Amino acid sequence: MSSIYKLRDFEKKRITVADLKSVPDVLVIEEVKKCFGVSTSIYFIFDKIWENKLSLEIGCSQGLVYGFTRYDDKHERAYKLISFLGEKLNFDFYEVNS
């Protein structure tokens, strides 16, 4: 089951992909996809510490991070990773089940 994790007050916090890239032990990957001839960047975040990779898609709007999407059943690990990022970058979040 997938889940969406949204940042509270993301417009005020102004967290960017560059901010996420600055956190130690976290890897941000950019994938460029073409949709109807238009290139679109999709960002994923990986935790390098755990043996099994955890992948979260980063939701961005006008350069600001507004949330993350998890497509697997690793809820506890995703929650811990986002909590870790929240501590490092000073943001709070909530989960929206989909």
Per-range role (PLM):
Residues M1-S98:
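Acidic (Asp/Glu-rich) sequence patches and key acidic residues
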